[in-house]
């Protein structure tokens, strides 16, 4: 179901109901019915649909009404569109998508860019190396930025690391100063993952192409099934977060850092990235899928490749499905 697309509103009844309930307080069936212009029995049907389509937990208490088990911070078109438009980005806001990256690629095929896709939930969210990205409704931030890139390899090198830097600085500005980077583009807090990034290309990477930067940030999620690694969320550290404020802060950081990257390349941001790398000068193992290399992390090169000191010899690694882990 699509809520907003190019300024048009869909599925208004359900979204109006969620907006009323997002404060986490009790609302009577009469109050909800009057707001929606339907009977109390119809309200219950709407609520059942909300539960079915979003998996949100609802409480029904006789004499008090209905409330969500946890408050929500729904994405708000009125708050987001003006700022995105000022940056020159078209905003596409959805309730549920298969994947924000997949939708961004579909929109690119119709000739649109630059653009930002946001969704309340993903049914087939994707991370690096084909992993699932768990994407419950209204809990986290799922977004994809699609840009046109000219200049070939120079403009692409290090871009995923720059996006990670923008995400990390966003989290620090939101009140999480301990956020740090793990090569190539994950963001960690206290040894646990809080954000991941997936870059996908379409077109000719040697000349003109489009880049889709998919970003997932754990925001207000308390628990989740299907995550196979230690994770944390903003909520755990600073309490409930307004996801509109987070989205706008992230958009601003992305524009700042990507504009600088377009001007100076990754080399102009390399020192800042290395200063934030949580495993800098630590002994780690890099896996390529078929081989493993153990050594001390020296940093990154001017293209964003990982520099490892292996048996007294410095080597650089980039591209492919590489994975870095800390040696115990």
Segments the model singles out, each with a brief description of its role:
Residues 2-39, 45-48, 53, 152-179, ...:
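Long, positively charged amphipathic alpha-helical accessory segments at protein N-termini or as interdomain linkers
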Residues 4, 10, 15-172:
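N-terminal lobe of the biotin/lipoate ligase/transferase fold
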Residues 61, 136, 182, 300-301:
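A short, compositionally biased micro-patch
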Residues 95, 181-183:
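Short loop/edge segments at beta-strand edges and connector loops
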Residues 186:
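Conserved active-site carboxylates
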């Amino acid at each position: 179901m699509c809520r907003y697309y190019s300024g048009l509103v869909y599925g208004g009844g359900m979204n109006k109901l969620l907006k009323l309930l997002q404060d986490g307080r009790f609302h009577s069936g009469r109050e909800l019915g009057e707001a929606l212009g339907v009977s109390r029995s119809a309200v219950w049907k709407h609520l059942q649909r909300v539960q079915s389509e979003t998996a949100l937990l609802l409480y029904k208490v006789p004499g008090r009404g209905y409330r969500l088990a946890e408050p929500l911070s729904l994405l708000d078109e009125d708050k987001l569109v003006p700022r995105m438009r000022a940056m020159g980005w078209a905003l596409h806001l959805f309730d549920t998508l298969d994947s924000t990256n997949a939708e961004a690629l579909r929109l690119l095929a119709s000739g649109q860019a630059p653009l930002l896709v946001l969704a309340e939930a993903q049914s087939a969210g994707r991370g690096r190396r084909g992993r699932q990205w768990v994407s419950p409704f209204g809990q986290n931030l799922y977004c994809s930025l699609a840009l046109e890139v000219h200049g070939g390899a120079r403009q692409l090198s290090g871009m995923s690391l720059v996006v990670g830097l923008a995400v990390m600085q966003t989290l620090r500005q939101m009140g999480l100063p301990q956020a740090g980077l793990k090569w190539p583009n994950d963001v960690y807090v206290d040894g646990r993952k809080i954000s991941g990034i997936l870059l996908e290309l379409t077109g000719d990477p040697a000349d003109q192409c489009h880049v889709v930067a998919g970003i997932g940030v754990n925001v207000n999620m308390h628990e989740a099934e299907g995550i196979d690694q230690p994770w944390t969320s903003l909520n755990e550290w600073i309490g409930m977060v307004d996801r509109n404020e987070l989205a706008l802060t992230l958009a601003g950081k992305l524009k700042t850092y990507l504009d600088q990257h377009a001007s100076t390349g990754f080399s102009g941001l390399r020192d800042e990235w290395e200063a934030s790398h949580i495993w800098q000068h630590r002994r780690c193992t890099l896996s390529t899928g078929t081989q493993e290399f153990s050594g001390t992390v020296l940093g990154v090169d001017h293209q964003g490749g990982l520099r490892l000191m292996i048996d007294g010899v410095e080597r650089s690694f980039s591209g492919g499905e590489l994975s870095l882990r800390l040696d115990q």
